[in-house]
Amino acid sequence: MSSVPPPATDRSATDRPATDCRVAERPAVDAAAFASEVVTAFQPVVLRGQVRHWQAVAAGRGSDRAMAEYLAAFGAPGGKPLDVMIAPPEVEGRFFYADETLTRFNFHRQQVPIGALVAELLRYAETDAALPHTLYANAATAPEHLPGWEGANPLDLGIDAPARLWIGNATRIATHYDTSINIACVVAGRRRFTLFPPDQLPNLYVGPLDHTMAGPPSSMVDPDAPDLTRYPRFADALTHAQVAELEPGDALFIPPTWWHHVRAFGRLNVLVNYWWEHRSGAAFLALVHAIGAVRDLPAAEKQAWHSWYEHLVFAPDAAQAADHLPPSARGILGPDSTDRTGRIRQFLINMLQRP
């Protein structure tokens, strides 16, 4: 980390949110209510105080130094270094593309032990300067990188997924979506999530699908300073936006495919999230394949395939489309199962390998 230049102060903590519309809130829930009420509603919701009992939250509410020392204590031998994104001061915490070609990013990556990362963040936090480099460790799985974290900070919502840590200073993460169900828990610092429903996709001006910063594609629009001349439809997206302001101990449930911009305020910020039901990621792969196989067909032919997609995929009764066949003959049109998933995978492999 010695190559990172001297630090600076965050000048952006007083910036106003993009909208006054707030995400719905409720108090902390137990596992039963989470499964039956929160997950099934398919709407974002703030769970106030959901993880206020965590040891890590107590450290985060204490001071930057207390938080840094708590994190460093998990840097035992055997813990893997973290993948850290490092951006120069002039990007003001916004990880994005470097220029109009969209071929390069405005940051680089470095493998850093947890102890070295928090020491650098603490040095930044305790130094009064103008504007810092931005450091951001993203999606570090606790079992691999911070062994012992999950035992000390249990979520208790019946989620079968590892805790993932996001550690940095004042960051701005471009509007993106996740293919999995997501619950994000703030440990230290303050987080602002700006969310857009899935149907706002056309108004978000999505960037490249196959050259992205961290997996999913991102909106090209900066919600903190939108260029409405270049991206006029984003004004419509803002009328549907919702904002969640989170303090340490709060959690936010985000349904899959909901777009969200994430902003962290402060000198040392820690968030823990959980993704599960990862199979939904296959839907994006199917979309990409459809772009190549269907999108550019002649209009009449494409309309014919639209009928197939509607009948077998999107119609309310699509799961019953093969009910006229005996169960033994339904094959990949049969009900969801591990066996069907394997058969579909093998069918696709066989088809894609043909000359």
Regions found by a protein language model. Name each.
Residues 1-10, 15-251, 259-355:
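N-terminal accessory scaffold of Fe(II)-dependent oxygenases
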